[in-house]
A protein has these predicted regions:
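Non-catalytic C-terminal accessory region of glycerolipid acyltransferases
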Residues: 82-190
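Secondary-structure boundary/capping positions in well-ordered alpha/beta enzyme cores
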Residues: 10-11, 46-47, 71, 96, ...
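Thr-Gly-centered strand-to-loop micro-motif
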Residues: 15, 51-52, 73-75, 103, ...
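A generic structural signal for well-ordered alpha-helical segments
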Residues: 4-5, 65, 92, 124
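Glycine-rich helix-loop-beta junction characteristic of Rossmann-like nucleotide cofactor-binding loops
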Residues: 16-20
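N-terminal membrane-anchoring alpha-helices
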Residues: 1-13
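Generic preference for hydrophobic
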Residues: 14, 27, 49-50, 156-158
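Catalytic core of membrane glycerolipid acyltransferases/transacylases, capturing the structured
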Residues: 5-7, 22-78
Length: 190
């Protein structure tokens, strides 16, 4: 991130840190750029990521990811992938890790979204935890599949935790998605 600040004049600021729970939690994070993948390591406490298992086979990157003890899933696995997130997510939470989930399942171009996957919310419900929605405008400065970076300040906004206990999982997901996408609209650079 330091190199991006110096070479590309691309800085960032985080808003809403007061919303971070005191204990390990599940974060639902907007995925629109490669930037947030790098930045989340500095922004959030000790963490593990739910990611596509193919990334583990990329030389050097896979080795680095292995150190984070990721929950590497086969995205085509459906229910099996959800079970992996539940089982491994519970274990990582017990070890004190925060579980980072990109609920769209892949990077989405700015202005686009898709139905959020359920595994993050189901894990939160299984552990009686809230989900923490997080959005940012990095996609405006470092677009998906783009190497050119625009100078500016990326804004990361951490939202209030969303309770999951006693709430229909789909309703929690819809609320998180609505907060993430609506807040993102307010972050468009001028």
């Amino acid at each position: 991130l330091w190199m991006l600040r110096v070479l590309c004049r691309l800085d960032y600021r985080v808003e809403g840190r007061e919303h971070l729970p005191a204990r390990s939690s599940i974060v639902l994070l907007k995925h629109s750029s490669a930037w947030e993948t790098l930045a989340q390591i500095r922004i959030f406490p000790r963490q593990t990521w739910v990611l596509k298992r193919e990334l583990m086979w990329v030389p050097i990157l896979g080795w680095v990811l292995w150190l984070l003890k990721p929950i590497a899933i086969d995205r085509r696995g459906g229910g099996v992938a959800v079970q992996q997130v539940l089982e491994q997510g519970r274990a990582r939470l017990a070890e004190g890790f925060w579980v980072m989930v990109f609920p769209e399942g892949t990077r989405m171009p700015v202005g686009q979204t898709r139905r959020y996957g359920m595994s993050g919310v189901l894990l939160a419900q299984a552990e009686a935890l809230p989900v923490v929605p997080v959005t940012h405008n990095a996609g405006f400065f470092w677009p998906r599949r783009g190497w050119l970076k625009k100078p500016g300040t990326i804004r990361v906004v951490i939202g209030p935790p969303i309770a999951t206990s006693g709430v229909e999982p789909r309703a929690v997901n819809e609320r998180a998605q609505q907060w993430i996408e609506n807040t993102l609209e307010t972050l468009r650079p001028k």
